[in-house]
């Protein structure tokens, strides 16, 4: 399966294919001339796939070094980025060379940020190995690192030269890590694909883990939602905000819990349920939709709430949300399953939203 992210200034393909990792040398050769490559990966994923990828790239004529960092959201910071910049410089990476992200969302965000800022920008490719990264963060060009104030506070819009998705790598994920990615899949269904919602209604996490043909279909449909939105609004000024359904409260939960304690897809699931509950009470979403969303996230092993729910800490994190404009924050609601809408809320109203 192939999707084309047909942006006017930087079009690229997303390849979705079981077993694609075994053909990585040919794929990279079709996109880049023979050059130096820094492979960026965390210690866990690098241990699983790193040497195989390096061997194939070297066999195809590339000169490769690997920058490995400690697994987890806590590594997505300026210190790790600086270490990566220095690593690239010591290897002699120039603007004609490139960076490949091999890993989940943390790796993709970090590697993309490093590539977009090293020497004011060099080429990079995405090879996502988590479900969250495959269906969401590897596509669209958002890169970033966290600060203590907010998630992804420092970042750029920089499109990759290509994305290679191999669903078979998901077999190495634990159940929690796999289900976490379904938070973003459920979000895609809610904002833009009712047929995907119906498919998720008919399936279960167990079905998906046992049937990789279904996984491939779900990845494709989720990527297509992301592709359409990114092509319509590359820089996040309009409809791309729909992709943030559940993320306003979700990012605040991640921040207040401590990065990595609540996984991103889990936080998105919590955020979707909580913002829907508020919007339903205010008549902005239909009666009963929150229960439908809650039932779906729980069916796929995701949380619908977070404790301790500290309104003051959550509000402080929300004030640094990237969707804030002055004292107004743009939240996303779902008027009906398969559609989305922007709802502008003042900070004072958001304080009320956070009260339980």
Swiss-Prot record:
UniProt similarity note: Belongs to the sugar phosphate cyclases superfamily. Dehydroquinate synthase family.
Binding-site residues, Zn(2+): 184, 247, 264
Gene name of this polypeptide: aroB
Keyword Lyase listed: yes
Note on how the cofactor is bound: Binds 1 divalent metal cation per subunit. Can use either Co(2+) or Zn(2+).
Subcellular location: Cytoplasm
Keywords, alphabetical: Amino-acid biosynthesis, Aromatic amino acid biosynthesis, Cobalt, Cytoplasm, Lyase, Metal-binding, NAD, Nucleotide-binding, Zinc
Example of a GO cellular component annotation carried by this entry: cytoplasm
Residues reported in the UniProt entry to bind NAD(+): 71-76, 105-109, 129-130, 142, 151
Keyword Protease attached: no
Name the record gives this protein: 3-dehydroquinate synthase
Catalytic activity line of the entry: 7-phospho-2-dehydro-3-deoxy-D-arabino-heptonate = 3-dehydroquinate + phosphate
Gene Ontology biological-process entries: amino acid biosynthetic process; aromatic amino acid family biosynthetic process; chorismate biosynthetic process
UniProt enzyme class: lyase
Single GO molecular function: nucleotide binding
Enzyme Commission code: 4.2.3.4
Pathway field: Metabolic intermediate biosynthesis; chorismate biosynthesis; chorismate from D-erythrose 4-phosphate and phosphoenolpyruvate: step 2/7
Cofactor(s) required for function per UniProt: Co(2+); Zn(2+); NAD(+)
Gene3D superfamilies: 3.40.50.1970, Dehydroquinate synthase-like - alpha domain (1.20.1090.10)
Database matches in InterPro entries: Dehydroquinate_synthase, DHQ_synth_AroB, DHQ_synth_fam, DHQS/DOIS_N, DHQS_C
Species this chain originates from: Lactococcus lactis subsp. cremoris (strain MG1363)
């Amino acid at each position: 399966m192939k999707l084309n992210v047909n942006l006017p200034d930087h079009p690229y393909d997303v390849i979705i294919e079981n077993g694609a990792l075994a053909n990585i040398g040919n794929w990279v050769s079709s996109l880049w001339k023979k050059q130096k490559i820094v492979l960026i990966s965390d210690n866990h994923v690098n241990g699983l796939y790193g040497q195989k990828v390096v061997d194939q790239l070297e066999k195809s004529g590339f000169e490769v070094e690997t920058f490995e960092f400690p697994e987890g959201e806590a590594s997505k910071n300026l210190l790790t980025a600086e270490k990566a910049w220095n690593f690239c410089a010591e290897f002699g990476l120039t603007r004609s060379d490139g960076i490949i992200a091999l890993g989940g969302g943390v790796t993709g965000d970090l590697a993309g940020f490093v590539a977009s800022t090293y020497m004011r920008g060099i080429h990079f490719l995405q090879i996502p190995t988590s479900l969250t990264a495959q269906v969401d963060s590897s596509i669209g060009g958002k890169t970033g690192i966290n600060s203590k104030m907010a998630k992804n506070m420092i970042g750029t819009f920089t499109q990759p030269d290509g994305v290679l998705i191999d669903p078979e790598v998901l077999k190495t994920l634990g159940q929690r890590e796999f289900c976490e990615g379904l938070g973003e899949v459920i979000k895609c269904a809610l904002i833009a694909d009712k047929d995907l919602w119906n498919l998720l209604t008919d399936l279960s996490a167990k079905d998906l883990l046992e049937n990789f043909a279904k996984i491939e279909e779900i990845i494709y449909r989720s990527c297509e939602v992301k592709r359409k939105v990114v092509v319509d609004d590359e820089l996040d000024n309009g409809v791309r905000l729909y992709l943030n359904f559940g993320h306003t409260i979700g990012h605040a939960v991640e921040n207040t819990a401590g990065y990595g304690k609540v996984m991103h897809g889990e936080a998105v699931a919590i955020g979707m349920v909580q913002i829907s509950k508020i919007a339903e009470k205010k008549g902005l979403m239909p009666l009963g939709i929150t229960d439908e969303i809650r039932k779906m996230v729980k069916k796929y092993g995701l949380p619908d709430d977070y404790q301790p729910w500290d309104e003051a800490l959550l509000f402080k994190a929300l004030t640094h949300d990237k969707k804030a404009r002055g004292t107004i924050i743009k939240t996303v609601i779902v008027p009906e399953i398969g559609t989305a809408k922007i709802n502008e809320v003042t900070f004072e109203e958001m304080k009320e939203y956070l009260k339980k």
